[in-house]
């Protein structure tokens, strides 16, 4: 079994994600995980940094001064890791238990990464299917990915390795073995992604609308020495050893979606654990993270889910 101290868990977020980052790290510490955390942050106060550092073995990397979407900077933070292995975990997520023994791929030539089933692809590529059925990566996108990798790396695979793309919210690999792969990924992000803040998706991009996720999938498909995707994704198999990613808005420290609410008790228990440990919290505990409000939060799900959608629609109208 690999030494957990030779693996760094990397995440990223701005001050609006302080609760999310805090609870991600807290979930690891509550479960007895000892991995280092490297956190890329923007607009953090010294106090906010200390709130994370009190959780133990947490290093902060300031990303102030860059206007890019933070999701486009994942590779830059990963490259600052000092350990041989690295695990990426999005900050709107948590571990349900001690997962140290399943984080890393069994083989250093592999990456622990979840490829989508064909049935998931139409949603991921909605509006970007180029007239195809959407069940696999569109040919036009693959052609662009291949050409961009060839320009950056000097050569590229003649054919894609995978039919479908994978989720960029979690992955783990040997950085000692695959640093060049991450450097190519970083260079591709510099080349093709916006330099301003566009959020986590940019539908105006024909070939890279999922930003960091599109670019890492391009690299996995066409970089010649890319790590192979591990055959079995292990972070969604056992209830006591899950990586839970809160995909949609609102995030649990703001409100709850129907899908996320399944994990209400687990997530709130992290706040209760932090309080019992005497830790400084990111602020007053939000009402949506109080066990006593569980029934109310369930009733409010339709409104809390609709609110961000209305806000986005209004923002779009005002931009016209």
Name each region found by the language model:
Residues 1-320:
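Glycosyltransferase catalytic domains, chiefly GT-A lineage
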